[in-house]
């Protein structure tokens, strides 16, 4: 209700669905099923890298995790995520890289659902594409219950996911971002 969408839009893979419409759909889902931790994670578990379109293709073609992420970031506005991603690196030798997923532009009433869905979806998509970041930790804006469920989605111990942080960060050993991806194709990567 109130989305401006009808059944034809939902079956048309070329239909344009705007962010405000998606947020209204999320509000309707939450109103119907209840605002409970893990609802977004359940939805994110159905993600695949193929559903991200050309961005997923760029991720698969990238020779390393770093290059795949750096190629995909400028095009994320074309993807189903509402998180703003960036890759940052610590200065300590042998330290960590951080895939930052800012959520400050998402309306507060749907933010937890979207963060859950998109971070769990990323975990599912990476697992399906055999991309192992070997995360050591996740810092998240989510509450404790959601953080624990997010740990499960990424295959981490509960203690490795810190709740109620200022932003969302996937903590990756720095050397992992330069590991060659199993499906890397340099000829395809040159196209991007």
Task: Describe each PLM feature range.
Residues 8, 103-104, 175-177:
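A broad detector of the eukaryotic-type serine/threonine protein kinase catalytic domain
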Residues 1-97, 145-149:
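N-terminal low-complexity or simple alpha-helical regulatory segments
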């Amino acid at each position: 209700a109130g989305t401006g969408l009808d059944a034809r839009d939902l079956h048309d893979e070329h239909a344009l669905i705007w962010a405000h419409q998606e947020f209204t759909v999320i509000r309707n889902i939450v109103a119907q099923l209840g605002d409970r931790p893990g609802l977004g994670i359940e939805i994110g578990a159905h993600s695949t890298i193929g559903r991200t379109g050309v961005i997923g293709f760029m991720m698969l073609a990238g020779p390393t995790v770093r290059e795949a992420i750096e190629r995909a970031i400028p095009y994320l506005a074309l993807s189903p995520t509402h998180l703003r991603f960036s890759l940052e690196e610590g200065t300590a030798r042998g330290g960590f890289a951080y895939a930052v997923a800012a959520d400050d532009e998402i309306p507060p009433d749907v933010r937890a659902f979207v963060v859950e869905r998109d971070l769990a979806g990323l975990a599912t998509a990476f697992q399906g594409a055999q991309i192992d970041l070997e995360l050591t930790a996740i810092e998240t804006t989510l509450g404790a219950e959601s953080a624990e469920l997010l740990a499960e989605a990424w295959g981490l111990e509960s203690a490795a996911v810190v709740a109620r942080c200022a932003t969302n960060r996937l903590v990756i050993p720095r050397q992992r971002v330069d590991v060659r991806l199993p499906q890397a194709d340099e000829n395809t990567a040159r196209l991007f």
